[in-house]
Regions:
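Phosphate/dinucleotide-binding and metal-coordinating scaffold of catalytic cores
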Residues: 1-265
């Protein structure tokens, strides 16, 4: 039986909270899933359905209850690659020939290192290399390379998968942005581990035009930038516009949204 370890970011650190199991995987059935919280974790946080739990539907408990409906745990759809990110991973892992259920398992195991939110699959974390920890890119790299940035980053030795945690049809990247005082310019980097609370570099979700990236697609993305500012002026609670930016690349614009799920102390 295949199993994956689930982690949660709680009070400033990643901790193991449970095991996702595939009880029928020996029969090549990856659609049936179960979640069992770790015993010590369940003892400390029993019955909590807040950020300690994987979802409201699965509060922390000692035993898994499928409510008489065995199958796919819906919260997994929220953390595994989807949309443009899924297409990248399916191609990158060369799993086009697998069934969608088998693809889901492989994507959970290898591509769920940095989803939006406070959950991740521990098995997805790449081996740590010094070159990847000290690899920086320019803003021009991100805004001009657009969809090719991941391949470019991978070729240079970065753990590019750490930038793929956002779902949706529009291509998106999860990046960090800081300032290099030596060169006097901004530095962009990929943070697949998200484990250094002393680093205050900004967290961004960088969004590119969806579809065929036509003039209309590009203008829709540009309009989104201004809509956020108008909503903020009207007093509507939305993504913070502090640090939000609209960058014009050689071919397409990119919208840099501050991460709403990350708080830097």
């Amino acid at each position: 039986m295949e199993e994956l370890t689930l982690e949660a970011f709680i009070r400033g650190e990643w901790i193991d909270i449970g095991i996702i199991s595939f009880p029928k995987s020996s029969q090549h059935n990856f659609r049936v899933t179960e979640l069992n919280y770790l015993s010590d974790y369940a003892l400390e946080h029993h019955d909590k359905d807040d950020f300690h739990a994987v979802s409201l539907n699965h509060p922390v408990s000692f035993f898994f209850d499928d409510m008489g409906k065995p199958g796919w745990l819906k919260f997994l759809d929220d953390i595994m690659p989807s949309g443009a990110s899924r297409r990248y991973w399916v191609k990158h892992l060369d799993i086009e020939d697998l069934s969608s259920d088998e693809q889901d398992y492989v994507l959970l195991k290898f591509g769920t290192m940095s989803p939006i939110g406070n959950l991740r699959v521990k098995d997805s974390l790449p081996e740590r290399y010094e070159v990847a920890d000290n690899l920086y890119f320019s803003v021009d790299d991100v805004k001009n390379r657009a969809g090719d940035f991941l391949d470019y980053a991978q070729q240079r030795g970065a753990a590019a998968g750490g930038a793929t945690g956002a779902g949706g049809e529009a291509p998106k990247l999860i990046l960090r942005c800081g300032f290099d005082h030596g060169s006097g310019s901004e530095k962009i980097w990929i943070d697949p581990y998200q484990d250094d609370n002393s680093n205050h570099d900004l967290h961004y979700l960088v969004k590119y035009p969806r579809g065929s990236r036509s003039t209309i697609d590009c203008n829709i993305l540009r309009a989104e930038f201004y809509f956020y500012h108008e909503l903020t002026e009207m007093g509507v609670e939305t993504i913070s516009t502090d640090g939000m930016r609209l960058e014009e690349g050689l071919n397409y614009p990119s919208l840099w949204l501050p991460r709403f799920d990350v708080q830097i102390n």
